Structures are given as structure tokens and as C-alpha cells.
A protein has these predicted regions:
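Short strand-coil-strand connectors
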Residues: 26-28, 67-71, 94
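A structure-centric signal for secondary-structure junctions around beta-strands
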Residues: 29-31, 53, 97
Length: 106
């Protein structure tokens, strides 16, 4: 079979509201995460310099802020932001019922 299929709702969150789909899809290079969160949800500050992979954050619904190397980028539904591997980032949701897809790969 040339594809794999998974529903994020069938994947146990590894952190509150975070559904990591890489294993469920059998993906070797691309990580995909769905985040469902309410106002005030904040992710941990991190970077991906060791893995040398960039990430794209796509906000589907709600409102969020992505702080990249100390600069805050406000996001509305439909906005996408790409972040360099070495950049430090922190994600914060600013509205209830927000949903985001994060994809990352080398």
C-alpha cells in the first residue's frame, strides 16, 4: 500500500491537547501534530537545532501567538508561519476552541 491513514482523534495526546501523528502514520521524515487548545494554553519554549528541521505552524481556527527568538507573531485563522530549526519558539493560544496543525521535517 502506498499510503497510511490516521485520525488525530484516535491518537492519545502526549501533552494536553497535542496529538502527534508521526508514529500513527509511520512517517520517517515528517512530523505532524494537531493541537486543540483554549485561551491561555502555552507550549514549552524549544528549538530544533539538534534535529535540523524546520516547522510550519498553520492555525485553522481561533487565535494564537508564536514567539520566535523573542519576537511575537500574532496569528489569525488561516495564517501559517515557518520557523528556522535553530530559532527558539513558544506557542500560546489566545482564544477558546483553537486548532492548529504543526508540520516539521529536515
Amino acid at each position: 500500500m502506498g499510503y497510511d491513514r490516521a485520525s488525530y482523534t484516535d491518537v492519545e495526546p502526549r501533552a494536553p491537547g497535542m496529538h502527534f501523528l508521526r508514529d500513527a502514520l509511520g512517517s520517517e521524515a515528517l512530523g505532524v501534530t494537531v493541537v486543540e487548545a483554549d485561551d491561555g494554553w502555552e507550549g514549552m519554549e524549544h528549538d530544533h537545532a539538534d534535529g535540523d528541521h524546520e516547522e510550519v505552524y498553520l492555525l485553522l481556527t481561533g487565535s494564537a501567538s508564536l514567539t520566535v527568538d523573542g519576537e511575537t507573531v500574532a496569528m489569525d485563522a488561516g495564517d501559517a508561519v515557518r520557523v528556522d530549526p535553530a530559532s527558539t519558539r513558544t506557542l500560546t493560544f489566545d482564544a477558546d476552541d483553537s486548532r492548529m496543525v504543526i508540520a516539521g521535517a529536515p
